[in-house]
C-alpha cells in the first residue's frame, strides 16, 4: 500500500505485443496501476473494474500503438447505471504514443489528467468528467477533442481547468463543456494548426467561462460560444484574453444567449463578459454578438464591460451586435469600456448596441 492504495506494478516492463488490463481490483482501498517507464510495442488498453477506484500511471511510457483508458458501466433495462468503475487520476507526463489517445471517463467523480510534455502521433479524444486536463508543452499531431465536461450539482470541487499552454496541436481543437462549475481554458503561446472551437452550456450561480489565449497562434478560426444558463442573478460572467494572439482565420465570440431557469431561450440580463485583445492579429472578420434572432429589448442585452482592441490588426470587418456597454469592469486595467487606439479593420459596425455608463 502507498497512500491507502494497492499497486499493480508493471513499471519498466517491455511488451512485444499488446497490453490489456481489465477489471483488476484491490481487495482493500484503491488500485494504482503503474506502467511508468514501460515499453509496449502494440496497443495499451486499461479498463477499470466495476465498483473500483483506479489510478493510472504512465509517466515516461513508450507505446507503439494506441492508448485506451476507460471506465465500465453496467445498466439495467431502463438505462439506469447499476455498477460503475472509477478512474480518479491519470498521470501520463512524457508519454510517447505512436497512435491515438482515447480516454472515456463518464463517472461523475471528475478525473484528473496530467499529460505534460507528452507526444501523441495520432489524435487525442478525451471524453467524460474531468477535474482538470493539464497538457501544457505537449505535442499532438492529430485533432484534439475534449468533450462533455459535466459536473455534479452543488459540487464543492473547483473550476474545471483545461491547459494546452505552449503546446502544439497539428489539427483542430474542440472543447465542449456543460454543468455547474466554471471552466477555465488556457492556450498561452499554444500553436494550433486548425480551428479552435470552445462551446457548450453552463448553468448555476457560479457558472462562467474564462479563456486565456495570449500569444497563441491559431492556423484556422477561433469560435467561443459557451452560454451560461442562469438560475441566480450574479456578477459573474465570461472573460476572454487574446492579447497578441494571431488568428489566421476569423474570430467569433457568441451568440451569447442563455436559458432562464424556466427553460425559455431568452437573453439573461445579468450575463456579462469582457474581451481583452490588445495587439490581436486576425486574417478574417471579428464578430462579437449576442443572439440577435431573439430580438430582446435593449435593457436585456448582454453586458460587454470591456472591449480592448488597442493595436489590433483585423484582416476583415469588426461586427458587434446586441450588447450593452457598461463601465462596471471587475478588472482594473485602466482602460475605457471600448478602446481601439491604433487598431485597423476593413470596416467597423455596432448594431443594436446600447450604452449604460454611470
Give residue spans per PLM region:
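N-terminal leader/targeting and pre-domain segments
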Residues: 1-358
Amino acid at each position: 500500500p502507498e497512500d491507502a492504495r494497492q499497486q499493480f506494478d508493471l513499471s519498466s516492463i517491455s511488451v512485444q505485443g499488446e497490453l490489456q488490463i481489465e477489471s483488476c481490483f484491490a481487495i482493500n482501498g484503491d488500485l494504482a496501476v503503474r506502467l511508468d517507464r514501460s515499453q509496449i510495442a502494440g496497443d495499451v488498453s486499461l479498463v477499470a473494474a466495476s465498483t473500483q477506484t483506479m489510478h493510472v500511471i504512465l509517466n515516461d511510457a513508450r507505446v507503439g500503438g494506441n492508448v485506451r483508458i476507460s471506465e465500465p458501466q453496467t445498466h439495467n433495462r431502463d438505462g439506469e447505471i447499476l455498477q460503475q468503475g472509477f478512474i480518479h487520476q491519470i498521470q501520463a507526463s512524457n508519454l510517447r504514443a505512436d497512435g491515438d489517445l482515447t480516454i472515456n471517463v463518464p463517472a461523475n467523480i471528475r478525473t484528473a489528467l496530467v499529460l505534460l510534455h507528452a507526444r501523441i502521433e495520432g489524435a487525442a479524444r478525451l471524453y467524460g468528467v474531468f477535474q482538470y486536463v493539464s497538457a501544457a508543452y505537449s505535442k499532438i499531431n492529430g485533432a484534439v477533442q475534449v468533450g462533455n465536461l459535466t459536473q455534479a450539482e452543488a459540487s464543492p470541487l473547483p473550476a474545471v481547468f483545461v491547459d494546452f499552454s505552449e503546446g502544439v496541436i497539428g489539427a483542430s481543437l474542440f472543447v465542449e463543456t456543460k454543468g455547474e462549475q466554471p471552466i477555465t481554458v488556457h492556450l498561452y503561446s499554444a500553436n494550433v494548426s486548425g480551428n479552435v472551437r470552445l462551446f457548450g452550456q453552463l448553468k448555476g450561480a457560479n457558472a462562467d467561462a474564462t479563456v486565456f489565449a495570449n500569444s497563441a497562434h491559431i492556423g484556422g478560426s477561433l469560435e467561443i460560444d459557451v452560454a451560461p444558463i442562469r438560475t441566480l442573478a450574479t456578477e459573474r460572467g465570461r472573460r476572454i484574453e487574446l492579447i497578441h494572439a494571431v488568428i489566421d482565420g476569423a474570430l467569433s465570440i457568441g451568440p451569447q444567449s442563455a436559458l432562464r431557469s424556466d427553460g425559455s431561450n431568452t437573453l439573461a440580463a445579468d450575463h456579462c463578459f469582457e474581451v481583452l485583445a490588445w495587439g490581436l492579429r486576425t486574417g478574417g472578420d471579428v464578430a462579437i454578438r449576442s443572439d440577435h434572432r431573439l430580438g430582446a429589448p435593449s435593457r436585456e442585452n448582454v453586458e460587454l464591460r470591456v472591449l480592448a482592441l488597442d493595436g489590433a490588426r483585423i484582416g476583415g470587418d469588426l461586427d458587434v451586435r446586441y450588447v450593452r456597454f457598461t463601465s462596471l469592469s471587475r478588472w482594473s486595467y485602466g482602460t475605457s469600456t471600448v478602446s481601439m487606439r491604433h487598431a485597423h479593420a476593413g470596416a467597423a459596425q455596432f448594431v443594436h448596441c446600447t450604452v449604460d455608463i454611470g
